[in-house]
Amino acid sequence: MRRSGTPKTQKDIIRAIADVQIADAENVLKVMLGSSDENMQKEVLYALSRVGSKASLSDLAAAAEKAGYKMEKTGANEAYIALIKRVLEQGDTKDAEKAANDLLKKSTKAGMTQTREAALQILLAAKPEAATKNLLSALKDTDKGYRNAALNFASGFADQNVYIEVMKHMLKAKPEVKVDILNWIGRESKCPSKHDVIKNLELRFDLPARQVLLDQLKDKDFYVQQAAVWALVKIGDKSVIPVLADLLKSNDKQVILLGQDALMAFNGDIDQAVAKVIPSASDAGKIAGLELLAIRMADANLNTVLDQIKSGSSEVKKAAYTALKDVVSEKDFTLLCGMLETAEASAVAPLQDAIIAAISKQPAATQVSNVNRRMIQAGDSKRYLYYKVLSATGEKEALATIVEGLNKGNGAAKDAALDALLAWKGIEAA
Protein backbone atom coordinates (compact mmCIF):
# COMPACT_ATOMS: atom_id res chain seq x y z
CA MET A 1 0.00 0.00 0.00
CA ARG A 2 2.92 2.32 0.71
CA ARG A 3 3.80 2.16 -2.97
CA SER A 4 0.21 2.53 -4.19
CA GLY A 5 -0.14 5.84 -5.96
CA THR A 6 -0.02 9.35 -4.56
CA PRO A 7 -0.29 10.24 -0.86
CA LYS A 8 -3.89 11.26 -1.48
CA THR A 9 -4.67 7.87 -3.00
CA GLN A 10 -3.03 6.14 -0.05
CA LYS A 11 -5.07 8.19 2.40
CA ASP A 12 -8.26 7.35 0.52
CA ILE A 13 -7.41 3.64 0.65
CA ILE A 14 -6.62 3.81 4.36
CA ARG A 15 -9.88 5.65 5.05
CA ALA A 16 -11.76 2.98 3.07
CA ILE A 17 -10.08 0.27 5.16
CA ALA A 18 -11.24 2.07 8.29
CA ASP A 19 -14.78 2.55 7.02
CA VAL A 20 -15.18 -1.07 5.90
CA GLN A 21 -13.18 -2.32 8.91
CA ILE A 22 -10.84 -4.73 7.13
CA ALA A 23 -9.18 -6.49 10.07
CA ASP A 24 -6.53 -8.16 7.90
CA ALA A 25 -5.00 -4.77 7.20
CA GLU A 26 -3.81 -4.28 10.80
CA ASN A 27 -0.20 -5.34 10.25
CA VAL A 28 0.16 -3.25 7.10
CA LEU A 29 -1.20 -0.22 8.92
CA LYS A 30 1.20 -0.71 11.84
CA VAL A 31 4.12 -0.58 9.42
CA MET A 32 2.90 2.81 8.24
CA LEU A 33 2.94 4.36 11.72
CA GLY A 34 5.41 7.15 12.33
CA SER A 35 4.85 9.01 9.07
CA SER A 36 6.18 12.56 9.02
CA ASP A 37 2.99 13.55 7.21
CA GLU A 38 0.57 14.45 10.02
CA ASN A 39 -2.47 13.89 7.84
CA MET A 40 -1.21 10.45 6.82
CA GLN A 41 -0.46 9.63 10.45
CA LYS A 42 -3.98 10.71 11.39
CA GLU A 43 -5.53 8.37 8.80
CA VAL A 44 -3.39 5.42 9.90
CA LEU A 45 -4.15 5.94 13.60
CA TYR A 46 -7.86 6.28 12.89
CA ALA A 47 -7.83 3.14 10.77
CA LEU A 48 -6.05 1.15 13.48
CA SER A 49 -8.62 2.32 16.02
CA ARG A 50 -11.28 0.84 13.72
CA VAL A 51 -9.65 -2.42 12.60
CA GLY A 52 -6.96 -3.06 15.21
CA SER A 53 -6.74 -5.60 18.00
CA LYS A 54 -4.82 -5.92 21.26
CA ALA A 55 -1.70 -6.31 19.11
CA SER A 56 -1.85 -2.61 18.29
CA LEU A 57 -2.39 -1.36 21.85
CA SER A 58 1.28 -0.68 22.58
CA ASP A 59 1.74 1.18 19.29
CA LEU A 60 -1.22 3.49 19.87
CA ALA A 61 -0.29 3.88 23.54
CA ALA A 62 3.07 5.26 22.44
CA ALA A 63 1.39 7.61 19.96
CA ALA A 64 -1.04 8.87 22.63
CA GLU A 65 1.82 9.44 25.06
CA LYS A 66 3.72 11.39 22.41
CA ALA A 67 0.59 13.51 21.88
CA GLY A 68 0.50 14.31 25.60
CA TYR A 69 -2.87 12.58 26.06
CA LYS A 70 -4.66 15.54 24.55
CA MET A 71 -6.38 16.45 21.32
CA GLU A 72 -3.99 17.38 18.51
CA LYS A 73 -3.75 17.10 14.73
CA THR A 74 -3.05 13.37 14.47
CA GLY A 75 -5.89 12.35 16.79
CA ALA A 76 -3.56 9.82 18.45
CA ASN A 77 -5.16 10.07 21.88
CA GLU A 78 -8.70 9.62 20.58
CA ALA A 79 -7.55 6.71 18.42
CA TYR A 80 -5.99 4.97 21.42
CA ILE A 81 -9.14 5.38 23.50
CA ALA A 82 -11.26 4.03 20.65
CA LEU A 83 -8.94 1.03 20.24
CA ILE A 84 -9.12 0.14 23.95
CA LYS A 85 -12.91 0.17 23.68
CA ARG A 86 -12.70 -2.02 20.59
CA VAL A 87 -10.41 -4.50 22.33
CA LEU A 88 -12.88 -4.68 25.21
CA GLU A 89 -15.72 -5.36 22.77
CA GLN A 90 -13.62 -8.11 21.19
CA GLY A 91 -13.58 -9.89 24.54
CA ASP A 92 -9.96 -9.23 25.47
CA THR A 93 -11.05 -7.83 28.80
CA LYS A 94 -7.78 -8.13 30.71
CA ASP A 95 -5.82 -6.38 27.97
CA ALA A 96 -8.40 -3.59 27.79
CA GLU A 97 -8.44 -3.25 31.58
CA LYS A 98 -4.65 -3.09 31.75
CA ALA A 99 -4.53 -0.47 29.00
CA ALA A 100 -7.28 1.60 30.62
CA ASN A 101 -5.53 1.50 34.00
CA ASP A 102 -2.26 2.58 32.42
CA LEU A 103 -4.00 5.37 30.52
CA LEU A 104 -5.78 6.53 33.67
CA LYS A 105 -2.52 6.78 35.64
CA LYS A 106 -0.57 8.54 32.91
CA SER A 107 -3.32 10.97 31.92
CA THR A 108 -3.83 11.80 35.61
CA LYS A 109 -0.15 12.62 35.91
CA ALA A 110 -0.40 14.72 32.74
CA GLY A 111 -3.47 16.54 34.08
CA MET A 112 -5.63 15.60 31.10
CA THR A 113 -9.11 15.35 32.64
CA GLN A 114 -11.04 14.33 29.53
CA THR A 115 -8.68 11.46 28.84
CA ARG A 116 -8.89 10.39 32.49
CA GLU A 117 -12.67 10.35 32.19
CA ALA A 118 -12.53 8.20 29.06
CA ALA A 119 -10.13 5.76 30.74
CA LEU A 120 -12.36 5.53 33.80
CA GLN A 121 -15.41 4.83 31.66
CA ILE A 122 -13.62 1.91 30.00
CA LEU A 123 -12.39 0.63 33.36
CA LEU A 124 -15.89 0.66 34.83
CA ALA A 125 -17.17 -1.35 31.86
CA ALA A 126 -14.20 -3.74 31.83
CA LYS A 127 -14.49 -4.73 35.47
CA PRO A 128 -18.13 -4.49 36.61
CA GLU A 129 -17.41 -6.30 39.88
CA ALA A 130 -15.07 -3.45 40.88
CA ALA A 131 -17.21 -0.65 39.45
CA THR A 132 -18.47 0.60 42.82
CA LYS A 133 -14.95 0.54 44.27
CA ASN A 134 -13.60 2.49 41.29
CA LEU A 135 -16.49 4.95 41.53
CA LEU A 136 -15.83 5.64 45.21
CA SER A 137 -12.14 6.07 44.43
CA ALA A 138 -13.02 8.62 41.74
CA LEU A 139 -15.18 10.51 44.23
CA LYS A 140 -12.07 11.17 46.33
CA ASP A 141 -10.49 13.06 43.43
CA THR A 142 -9.99 16.81 43.72
CA ASP A 143 -11.21 17.46 40.15
CA LYS A 144 -14.92 18.27 40.13
CA GLY A 145 -15.29 17.46 36.44
CA TYR A 146 -13.76 14.03 36.96
CA ARG A 147 -16.00 13.29 39.95
CA ASN A 148 -19.10 14.25 38.04
CA ALA A 149 -18.04 12.22 35.02
CA ALA A 150 -17.66 9.20 37.30
CA LEU A 151 -21.16 9.74 38.70
CA ASN A 152 -22.60 10.13 35.23
CA PHE A 153 -20.97 6.86 34.16
CA ALA A 154 -22.33 5.21 37.29
CA SER A 155 -25.87 6.04 36.21
CA GLY A 156 -25.55 3.20 33.73
CA PHE A 157 -25.08 0.54 36.40
CA ALA A 158 -26.31 2.13 39.63
CA ASP A 159 -28.62 0.00 41.74
CA GLN A 160 -29.71 -0.05 45.37
CA ASN A 161 -26.29 -1.17 46.63
CA VAL A 162 -24.46 1.49 44.63
CA TYR A 163 -26.73 4.22 46.01
CA ILE A 164 -26.15 2.98 49.55
CA GLU A 165 -22.36 2.97 49.16
CA VAL A 166 -22.29 6.39 47.53
CA MET A 167 -24.45 7.92 50.25
CA LYS A 168 -22.31 6.32 52.95
CA HIS A 169 -19.30 7.89 51.24
CA MET A 170 -21.08 11.24 51.27
CA LEU A 171 -21.41 11.21 55.06
CA LYS A 172 -17.63 11.57 55.43
CA ALA A 173 -16.99 13.63 52.31
CA LYS A 174 -15.94 17.24 51.94
CA PRO A 175 -18.66 19.80 51.11
CA GLU A 176 -17.80 19.99 47.41
CA VAL A 177 -18.06 16.20 47.07
CA LYS A 178 -21.33 16.17 49.01
CA VAL A 179 -22.74 18.67 46.53
CA ASP A 180 -21.78 16.46 43.58
CA ILE A 181 -23.35 13.38 45.15
CA LEU A 182 -26.52 15.15 46.23
CA ASN A 183 -27.00 16.63 42.76
CA TRP A 184 -26.49 13.17 41.26
CA ILE A 185 -28.98 11.55 43.64
CA GLY A 186 -31.51 14.20 42.65
CA ARG A 187 -30.95 13.54 38.95
CA GLU A 188 -31.15 9.78 39.44
CA SER A 189 -34.46 10.07 41.28
CA LYS A 190 -36.03 11.68 38.21
CA CYS A 191 -35.58 8.42 36.32
CA PRO A 192 -38.91 6.54 36.66
CA SER A 193 -37.26 3.15 37.10
CA LYS A 194 -35.00 4.45 39.88
CA HIS A 195 -37.32 6.85 41.71
CA ASP A 196 -38.89 4.41 44.15
CA VAL A 197 -35.55 2.72 44.84
CA ILE A 198 -34.09 6.05 45.98
CA LYS A 199 -37.24 7.22 47.77
CA ASN A 200 -37.38 4.04 49.87
CA LEU A 201 -33.63 3.59 50.25
CA GLU A 202 -32.19 2.64 53.65
CA LEU A 203 -28.48 2.82 54.46
CA ARG A 204 -29.24 0.42 57.28
CA PHE A 205 -32.46 -0.72 58.93
CA ASP A 206 -32.60 2.34 61.22
CA LEU A 207 -31.25 4.95 58.80
CA PRO A 208 -33.41 5.82 55.79
CA ALA A 209 -31.74 7.80 53.02
CA ARG A 210 -34.42 10.44 53.51
CA GLN A 211 -33.03 11.17 56.97
CA VAL A 212 -29.50 11.40 55.61
CA LEU A 213 -30.67 13.99 53.09
CA LEU A 214 -32.59 15.92 55.75
CA ASP A 215 -29.49 15.98 57.96
CA GLN A 216 -27.62 17.79 55.18
CA LEU A 217 -29.96 20.76 55.66
CA LYS A 218 -28.05 21.40 58.90
CA ASP A 219 -24.68 21.50 57.15
CA LYS A 220 -22.73 24.73 57.60
CA ASP A 221 -22.04 24.91 53.87
CA PHE A 222 -24.91 26.61 52.02
CA TYR A 223 -24.21 24.76 48.78
CA VAL A 224 -24.60 21.44 50.56
CA GLN A 225 -27.91 22.63 51.98
CA GLN A 226 -28.97 23.78 48.53
CA ALA A 227 -28.08 20.49 46.85
CA ALA A 228 -29.86 18.50 49.57
CA VAL A 229 -32.99 20.63 49.26
CA TRP A 230 -33.23 20.10 45.52
CA ALA A 231 -32.58 16.39 45.86
CA LEU A 232 -35.50 16.22 48.30
CA VAL A 233 -37.70 18.21 45.92
CA LYS A 234 -36.88 15.90 43.02
CA ILE A 235 -37.52 12.78 45.10
CA GLY A 236 -40.85 14.32 46.07
CA ASP A 237 -41.51 12.57 49.38
CA LYS A 238 -44.35 14.68 50.80
CA SER A 239 -43.32 13.91 54.38
CA VAL A 240 -40.41 16.36 54.04
CA ILE A 241 -42.62 19.36 53.22
CA PRO A 242 -42.79 20.59 56.87
CA VAL A 243 -38.99 20.46 57.10
CA LEU A 244 -38.63 22.49 53.91
CA ALA A 245 -41.21 24.95 55.25
CA ASP A 246 -39.08 25.38 58.38
CA LEU A 247 -36.39 26.92 56.16
CA LEU A 248 -38.63 30.00 56.03
CA LYS A 249 -37.90 30.45 59.75
CA SER A 250 -34.19 30.87 59.11
CA ASN A 251 -32.41 34.13 59.91
CA ASP A 252 -30.41 33.76 56.70
CA LYS A 253 -32.13 35.43 53.74
CA GLN A 254 -30.34 33.08 51.35
CA VAL A 255 -31.80 30.04 53.13
CA ILE A 256 -35.28 31.59 53.19
CA LEU A 257 -35.19 32.12 49.43
CA LEU A 258 -33.92 28.56 48.95
CA GLY A 259 -36.85 27.27 50.99
CA GLN A 260 -39.28 29.41 49.03
CA ASP A 261 -37.95 28.20 45.67
CA ALA A 262 -38.04 24.59 46.82
CA LEU A 263 -41.60 24.79 48.12
CA MET A 264 -42.71 26.58 44.98
CA ALA A 265 -41.33 23.71 42.90
CA PHE A 266 -42.56 20.90 45.15
CA ASN A 267 -45.23 18.74 43.59
CA GLY A 268 -47.55 18.48 46.59
CA ASP A 269 -49.78 20.39 49.00
CA ILE A 270 -47.51 22.82 50.83
CA ASP A 271 -50.22 25.21 52.02
CA GLN A 272 -50.75 24.06 55.61
CA ALA A 273 -47.04 23.64 56.32
CA VAL A 274 -46.30 27.14 55.01
CA ALA A 275 -49.21 28.72 56.89
CA LYS A 276 -48.01 27.07 60.10
CA VAL A 277 -44.51 28.61 60.00
CA ILE A 278 -45.48 32.14 58.94
CA PRO A 279 -46.37 33.42 62.45
CA SER A 280 -42.97 32.46 63.89
CA ALA A 281 -40.86 33.44 60.88
CA SER A 282 -38.83 36.61 60.47
CA ASP A 283 -40.26 39.35 58.27
CA ALA A 284 -38.36 37.95 55.28
CA GLY A 285 -39.74 34.50 56.03
CA LYS A 286 -43.26 35.83 56.49
CA ILE A 287 -43.11 37.61 53.14
CA ALA A 288 -41.76 34.49 51.41
CA GLY A 289 -44.53 32.42 52.98
CA LEU A 290 -47.25 34.87 51.97
CA GLU A 291 -45.95 34.86 48.42
CA LEU A 292 -46.10 31.06 48.41
CA LEU A 293 -49.70 31.03 49.64
CA ALA A 294 -50.56 33.48 46.87
CA ILE A 295 -48.80 31.44 44.18
CA ARG A 296 -50.57 28.27 45.34
CA MET A 297 -53.89 30.20 45.59
CA ALA A 298 -54.36 28.81 49.10
CA ASP A 299 -57.84 30.16 49.83
CA ALA A 300 -58.18 27.83 52.83
CA ASN A 301 -55.46 29.90 54.48
CA LEU A 302 -57.04 33.32 54.11
CA ASN A 303 -56.96 33.82 57.88
CA THR A 304 -53.18 33.46 57.90
CA VAL A 305 -52.94 36.32 55.41
CA LEU A 306 -55.46 38.41 57.35
CA ASP A 307 -53.49 37.89 60.57
CA GLN A 308 -50.41 39.41 58.93
CA ILE A 309 -52.47 42.37 57.75
CA LYS A 310 -53.48 42.98 61.35
CA SER A 311 -50.17 42.43 63.10
CA GLY A 312 -47.32 42.43 60.61
CA SER A 313 -44.69 45.10 59.96
CA SER A 314 -45.33 47.55 57.14
CA GLU A 315 -43.38 45.33 54.70
CA VAL A 316 -45.25 42.22 55.80
CA LYS A 317 -48.61 44.01 55.61
CA LYS A 318 -47.81 45.10 52.07
CA ALA A 319 -47.00 41.50 51.11
CA ALA A 320 -50.19 40.27 52.80
CA TYR A 321 -52.35 42.78 50.98
CA THR A 322 -50.68 41.82 47.70
CA ALA A 323 -51.37 38.14 48.40
CA LEU A 324 -55.00 38.76 49.30
CA LYS A 325 -56.39 38.63 45.75
CA ASP A 326 -55.00 35.11 45.28
CA VAL A 327 -56.37 33.58 48.49
CA VAL A 328 -59.99 34.80 48.44
CA SER A 329 -63.15 33.23 47.10
CA GLU A 330 -66.76 34.24 46.55
CA LYS A 331 -67.69 33.67 50.20
CA ASP A 332 -65.26 36.40 51.29
CA PHE A 333 -67.05 39.22 49.43
CA THR A 334 -68.76 40.77 52.47
CA LEU A 335 -65.62 40.57 54.60
CA LEU A 336 -63.53 42.24 51.91
CA CYS A 337 -66.08 45.00 51.39
CA GLY A 338 -66.01 45.78 55.09
CA MET A 339 -62.22 45.97 54.99
CA LEU A 340 -62.30 48.20 51.91
CA GLU A 341 -64.71 50.68 53.46
CA THR A 342 -62.45 51.14 56.50
CA ALA A 343 -59.07 50.83 54.79
CA GLU A 344 -56.15 53.23 54.77
CA ALA A 345 -55.40 54.76 51.39
CA SER A 346 -52.45 52.42 50.73
CA ALA A 347 -54.67 49.35 51.18
CA VAL A 348 -57.52 50.44 48.91
CA ALA A 349 -56.09 49.17 45.60
CA PRO A 350 -55.14 45.65 46.79
CA LEU A 351 -58.52 45.29 48.52
CA GLN A 352 -60.30 46.33 45.34
CA ASP A 353 -58.25 43.72 43.45
CA ALA A 354 -59.20 41.13 46.06
CA ILE A 355 -62.91 41.89 45.67
CA ILE A 356 -62.58 41.65 41.87
CA ALA A 357 -60.92 38.25 42.28
CA ALA A 358 -63.48 37.03 44.82
CA ILE A 359 -66.46 37.58 42.52
CA SER A 360 -64.69 36.88 39.23
CA LYS A 361 -66.39 33.51 38.71
CA GLN A 362 -69.86 35.03 38.91
CA PRO A 363 -71.71 36.16 35.77
CA ALA A 364 -70.93 39.82 35.07
CA ALA A 365 -74.53 40.90 35.70
CA THR A 366 -74.49 39.19 39.10
CA GLN A 367 -71.23 40.92 39.97
CA VAL A 368 -72.75 44.31 39.18
CA SER A 369 -75.89 43.54 41.18
CA ASN A 370 -73.89 42.48 44.25
CA VAL A 371 -71.56 45.48 44.05
CA ASN A 372 -74.46 47.92 43.60
CA ARG A 373 -76.13 46.57 46.72
CA ARG A 374 -72.91 47.00 48.65
CA MET A 375 -72.50 50.55 47.35
CA ILE A 376 -75.93 51.42 48.71
CA GLN A 377 -74.96 50.01 52.12
CA ALA A 378 -71.68 51.89 52.08
CA GLY A 379 -73.38 55.26 51.54
CA ASP A 380 -72.53 58.13 49.26
CA SER A 381 -69.20 58.84 50.93
CA LYS A 382 -67.85 55.36 50.13
CA ARG A 383 -69.48 54.61 46.77
CA TYR A 384 -66.44 55.63 44.79
CA LEU A 385 -64.40 52.82 46.37
CA TYR A 386 -66.30 50.38 44.15
CA TYR A 387 -65.85 52.11 40.79
CA LYS A 388 -62.72 50.07 40.03
CA VAL A 389 -64.61 46.87 40.89
CA LEU A 390 -67.47 47.86 38.59
CA SER A 391 -65.02 48.66 35.81
CA ALA A 392 -63.67 45.10 35.94
CA THR A 393 -67.13 43.67 35.18
CA GLY A 394 -67.30 45.23 31.70
CA GLU A 395 -71.09 45.66 32.04
CA LYS A 396 -72.83 48.67 30.47
CA GLU A 397 -74.86 49.23 33.63
CA ALA A 398 -71.62 49.52 35.56
CA LEU A 399 -70.27 51.99 33.01
CA ALA A 400 -73.31 54.22 33.51
CA THR A 401 -72.72 54.27 37.27
CA ILE A 402 -69.09 55.23 36.82
CA VAL A 403 -69.91 58.00 34.32
CA GLU A 404 -72.46 59.37 36.74
CA GLY A 405 -69.79 59.38 39.43
CA LEU A 406 -67.47 61.32 37.15
CA ASN A 407 -70.12 63.92 36.34
CA LYS A 408 -71.45 64.40 39.85
CA GLY A 409 -68.50 63.52 42.05
CA ASN A 410 -65.83 65.71 43.59
CA GLY A 411 -62.29 65.16 44.80
CA ALA A 412 -61.44 61.51 45.48
CA ALA A 413 -64.76 60.30 44.08
CA LYS A 414 -64.20 62.07 40.76
CA ASP A 415 -60.61 60.81 40.56
CA ALA A 416 -61.75 57.24 41.26
CA ALA A 417 -64.39 57.45 38.53
CA LEU A 418 -61.83 58.75 36.02
CA ASP A 419 -59.36 55.98 36.92
CA ALA A 420 -62.14 53.41 36.52
CA LEU A 421 -63.00 54.73 33.07
CA LEU A 422 -59.37 54.67 32.02
CA ALA A 423 -59.18 51.05 33.18
CA TRP A 424 -62.31 50.07 31.20
CA LYS A 425 -61.36 47.47 28.61
CA GLY A 426 -64.12 48.05 26.07
CA ILE A 427 -64.61 50.91 23.62
CA GLU A 428 -67.81 52.04 25.34
CA ALA A 429 -65.92 54.33 27.71
CA ALA A 430 -64.09 56.14 24.89
What are these regions (language model features)?
Residues 64, 95-103, 209, 337, ...:
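HEAT/HEAT-like alpha-solenoid repeats
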Residues 100-105, 126, 376-378:
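Amphipathic alpha-helical surface "interface" segments used
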Residues 1, 8-23, 28-34, 41-53, ...:
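Structural detector for internal amphipathic alpha-helices that build alpha-solenoid repeat scaffolds
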